Amino acid sequence: MGKSVGNLSLVEKVGQMFLVGIDGTVADEAVMELVQTYKIGGFVISDNNVESVEQLLRLINSLKAMNAGNEVPLIVAMSQEGGRANVLPSQIRKLPAIKYIAESGDKNLLAEVSSLTGKILRSFGINMNFAPVLDLGGAVEGRMLSDRCISTNPTIVSSYSSQIISAYKEEGIIPVPKYFPGHATTKNKGSSIVIPYTSKSIQKLEQVDLVPFKAAIENGIETMLVGHINLARLNLFAPATMSYKVITKLLKEKYEYKGVVIADDLCSACVDIQYGIKGSARRAILAGCDMMVIKDFRKVRGVLEDITKQIKKGNLDPKEIDLRVQKILDLKEKFNLKDEEITEFEIMRLNEEIEEVIEKIRR
C-alpha cells in the first residue's frame, strides 16, 4: 500500500509540489528547515552545487539524512544529458552529446550510453534525470539546444528517446522528457528575457513538433517537463507552463496524459520578470502543473507560504491539490525512492566503463 495524501498536512502537501535548488555546495540550516518543516518534494542539483565526487556524495547524503524523519522520500534530480549539458564532477569522464550518439544509428549503443548515465546517477543517489530532450533539431541548430537534440526527424526522436527512457527506468532513474511542447519552430529562443513563441497551428505542430511527446505519452511516460514556450494560436498571453489550454485541455485531456506535469524553472527571467515568482507558481498550478522547479533557493519559502495561503483562501482547489500530490506520492512509490546513504563510489570502474563506450562511439 503506497503513501496516502490524507496523511499529509496542508503545508506538507504544498511542499511536495516543488523541486528546488540550493545555494552552494553544502546543505545548511536553511535547507534543513525546508526539508523538515515544509517537507519539500525534492532538490535539483545544478553545476554550482558540484565541486567533486566526494563533495557531491556528502551533499546528497546530507539532504537525505535531513529527510530521514519524513515518511515521503526526496526526489534528487539533475539535468544530465551529456556533452556540454554536463553537471557531473570533472573526475567523471564526460559522455558525448546525445546527437552524436544518435547519428551513429546504433540503438544498442544509445541504450548502452543511457544505461551508463543512469548507473552513474544512481551511484550518487540521484533518482531523477531531466532528459531526454524531445525537441526537434534543425531549427534550433546553433541556438540554445543544438546538439542536445536527438534529430530533426520526429520519428527518429520518438524511437530513440524511447530507448533512452527505457534505459533510465531499468537503472531506477525517473526520466523526465522535455521541453513540451517543443522549441523547434519558436522565435526568440535565443533570448533569456522574452518567452519563445510559435505562431504555428496545433494541427501543424501535431504533424511534426509534438510527435515525440505524443509517442512518449502513448508509451506510458510517468513525467513530463513543460517549457516556457508560448503557443500563440492556442493561448496568446501565457507560456505553456501557465496555460490551462496547453496543460489541461491539450496535454491532459486531448492527449490523455496521466503522469506528473513538471513546470520548468519558475525563476527563469522570461517568466519571473513578467509574473513574479509567486504569480508564476499560482498560474502554473491553475494551468494544471503538478510540480514546479524553483532553482533560486532564496525564493522558495515565500512561494510555499503563498501557495498555502491561496489554498486556505479558496483561490486554489484543495481537492485538486490532493489529486496532484497523490500522483507525486505514487510516482515516488513506483520508482521505489528511498533516502538511503551512499557509502561507496568506484570512480575508476565507472570511468573504465565510460571509456569503453566512448571507444565504441569512435569506431
Map each language-model feature to its residues.
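Preference for extracellular/luminal or secreted protein segments
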Residues: 1-38, 254, 273-363
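Catalytic domains of carbohydrate-active enzymes, especially glycoside hydrolases
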Residues: 33-46, 115-128
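A charged helix-plus-loop insertion that forms the helical arch/lid used to bind
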Residues: 92-105, 149-151
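Active-site-adjacent structural elements in enzyme catalytic domains
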Residues: 54-65, 107-123
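Second-shell residues forming the walls of enzyme active-site clefts
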Residues: 21, 27, 49-68, 74-76, ...
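Active-site-proximal loop/short-helix segments
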Residues: 88-93, 127-147, 178-195, 227
